């Protein structure tokens, strides 16, 4: 199967695709929302972007298999985790996840969320 771009019409600030799909596997670039407000609002806005990209790829959050969360301050973990947990509240098997602090995130974001999904998950 050929490589398919997801969200090719989205504005980006570098040489990358918002998402790529090959053989039923979907990789999404890190999603940020630095203008959304506090950590909870940025987390929700980033997850909303992920939902839109997943839909464009023909899947939902129920098919997400791995998530990576980067925080500009690990002390924001609990606030991010509350929003993240609510997003997954109806998902039977949550994805594997890594979460850690990064020295700085693009555009001054407080959180960046990367996701992978599979059509057959």
How does the language model describe each region?
Residues 1-65, 71-121:
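N-terminal presequence-like segments and the immediate start of the first folded domain
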């Amino acid at each position: 199967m050929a490589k398919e771009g997801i969200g090719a019409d989205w504005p980006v600030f570098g040489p990358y695709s918002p998402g790529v799909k090959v053989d039923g596997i979907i990789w999404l670039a890190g999603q940020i929302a630095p203008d959304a407000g506090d950590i909870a609002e940025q987390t929700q806005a980033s997850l909303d972007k992920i939902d839109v990209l997943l839909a464009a790829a023909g899947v939902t959050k129920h098919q997400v298999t791995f998530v990576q969360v980067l925080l500009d301050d690990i002390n924001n973990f609990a606030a991010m985790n509350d929003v993240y947990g609510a997003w997954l509240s109806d998902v039977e098997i949550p994805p594997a996840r890594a979460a850690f602090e990064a020295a700085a995130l693009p555009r001054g974001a407080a959180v960046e969320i990367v996701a992978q999904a599979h059509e057959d998950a």
